[in-house]
């Protein structure tokens, strides 16, 4: 049909049981057969983000937010014009027939905001593996009118440096 299909899903927490995990893994394998790209967020990684006081509802809400941000991020790449536009053809060239994919997100304010956000995205605890062997990378930078040219360059340079050391 020619449509670009991207699946963004979670893998259950270990405490949800082996049966649920088996079902999820089978579903993920099925998705890989029909989707160009599948991004799997392991819910267990959320345990590294939260504190001991995080309730079950907050944990599941956090998992849902990660999924939402993943879908929204990809959608925004295509639909929201930026200073350096990424269009559907760019997204398709990286994600078509890509198989498994990773997604890192970073956010920061103030001094060293770009470096902090970039390092958060590259080293995100939600990433199950590294970028090693990546065939393509999509980078999206959002900022206010004060976002500087050198800051944007820092994102690209930091990513390249991280990718070279893998």
Indicate residue ranges for each PLM-predicted region.
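Tubulin/FtsZ superfamily GTPase core signature
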Residues: 1-164
């Amino acid at each position: 049909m020619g449509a670009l299909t991207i699946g963004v899903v979670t893998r259950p927490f270990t405490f949800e049981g082996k049966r649920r995990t088996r079902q999820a893994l089978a579903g993920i394998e099925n998705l890989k057969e029909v989707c160009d790209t599948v991004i799997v967020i392991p819910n267990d990684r959320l345990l590294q983000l939260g504190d001991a006081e995080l309730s079950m509802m907050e944990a599941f809400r956090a998992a849902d937010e990660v999924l939402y941000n993943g879908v929204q991020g990809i959608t925004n790449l295509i639909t929201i014009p930026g200073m350096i536009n990424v269009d559907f053809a760019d997204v398709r060239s990286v994600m078509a027939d890509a198989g498994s994919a990773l997604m890192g997100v970073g956010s920061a304010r103030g001094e060293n905001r770009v470096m902090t956000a970039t390092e958060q995205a590259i080293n995100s605890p939600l990433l199950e593996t590294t970028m090693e062997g990546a065939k393509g990378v999509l980078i999206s930078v959002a900022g206010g009118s004060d976002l500087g040219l050198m800051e944007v360059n820092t994102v690209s340079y930091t990513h390249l440096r991280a990718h070279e050391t893998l």
